[in-house]
Amino acid sequence: MRLPGVAKSTNREWSLQQRAIFEAFRSAPGHVLVRARAGTGKTTTILEALQYAPESKILLGAFNKQIADELQTRVNDPRVQAKTLHALGMGYIRAQVDDVRVDANNRAWDLVKDVADDAPQAIKIALKNLHTKVRELNPWAETTSDVERIAIAYDLVPDEAELRGKWTEGTYYETVLTILEHAADEVEVIDFADMIFLPLRRGWAWPVADLVVVDEAQDMTGPQLEIALRACRKDGRIVIVGDDRQAIYGFRGAASDGLNRLKARLEAVELGLTTTYRCGKAIVEVARALVPDFQAAPTAPEGTVRTAPLSAWMEAQPGDFVLSRVNAPLMGVALGLIRQGKRARIRGRDIGKGLVELVNKLKLSRLEDLDGALEQWSRREIARLSKKDQAVARTRIAQIMDNVDTLLTLAETVASVAELQRKLETLFSDEGASESVVMCSTIHRAKGLEAGRVWVLEDTLKGGNLEEENLRYVAVTRAKDELVLVTKNYVAPEGGEQ
């Protein structure tokens, strides 16, 4: 039974799985986990399900503001408020602090100057970046070990050359803890990180909804999920929606087993949404080797899957995706496509910015010095990381080598350091899927997107653990009609290449 006055969807035939979800929203006595696979109509299903919920105040938590705004325009129900969890946190802060002001540009820097104004400039910059990241990922940080783990994972350990006088790694981490205490006290001016940090650190998060629905839960950090759970009234319900097999942001603080841990904590009933309306049947079969419950819609086209030699990516056309686990191979692909006269970009403007900062850090006078400078820098960084927790350091070492390979690949096509920097600024873009450009992207950056034809650089993928398998699943399920697996191990079928 629908609620009185709620608009009824028309001309839509819902699946058995979708109807089970609607019934759970209507009558399930406790919390619910909806495990929704790639391209299964998750958003449409949840918006329809909300119409069955009897609660009078519903919070729909979204991953980012763009998604929250889109959801709010589609809800058309006064009981439902779609917002990011940062916006939820901001509401908690406004309730506690009169005339609070957001200053995203100066807040983090001002906190450093208040606590450590006598620090060398390089240390101040490092402190600013690290205390911001700790506020985002561990509002409850109490020990230097809590801080160090985040510093290593995000390349926020200062260079040995920057640690002088009283500044050791130990004092650096202790200072971050002092800044956190100061940030919790000075709350009249805040930034984005404070919107999660302050409600949790100060205990300001309280129940505001009878039903809390968290979308894309597998991508949320622990603190984001915690603030969502605290928003639910004691006798209310929580619905967690996500795909554990799209959990690929472990480096960003989203745990790969986060959905299962939430299910256990909430003692939630689980429902599945496993039929994809995106991928052709042949593509689904590839994905099923990784995720057995993944299914093609009965009306899905057959789709095409083929393997191809390494040079095949040169056939990519505007509108296609070329996906890799890491950035370095994408540089060669993008440059090769541009030489053919095709528009190509590498997704991730911030990646290009980071590489420009690395080039500046190397202080090169000649392009010929790049190779040696990168070798010295990478050896120094890896040697330092070898003394740290290896589970954390391993990811950072891989990033270091990817940065080195990316810069060396681009350097082969330019004549000066200045030209290298200019190309980095123009090649990397936040442009999304477009019919006018070949989008070269890491798998992480392509999550949530789709294309008719997707080229996957197979040899960049690793095996051996769940998150690596998840990356392959995400890559494969970006393709709607054609999936091309590019590999050096390609063997042409008898009678010639396919």
Predicted regions and their residues:
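Accessory N-terminal region flanking or inserted into the helicase ATPase core
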Residues: R2-A24, H31-L33, T45, Q121-V213, ...
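P-loop NTPase Walker
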Residues: R2-D99
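Conserved helicase motor core of SF1/SF2 NTP-dependent helicases
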Residues: R35-L47, Y52, F63-Q66, H86, ...
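Conserved P-loop NTPase-based nucleic-acid remodeling module centered on helicase motor cores
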Residues: K57, K65-R135, I338-G341, R345-L355
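Interdomain motor-coupling "hinge/lid" segment immediately C-terminal to the ATP-binding subdomain
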Residues: Q96-D185, L262-K263, V269-W313, G319, ...
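Catalytic glutamate of the conserved HExxH
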Residues: E216-D219, R478-A479
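ATPase/helicase motor core of nucleic-acid motors
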Residues: A264-R265, M314-D320, P329-E425
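C-terminal accessory regions
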Residues: M401-Q498
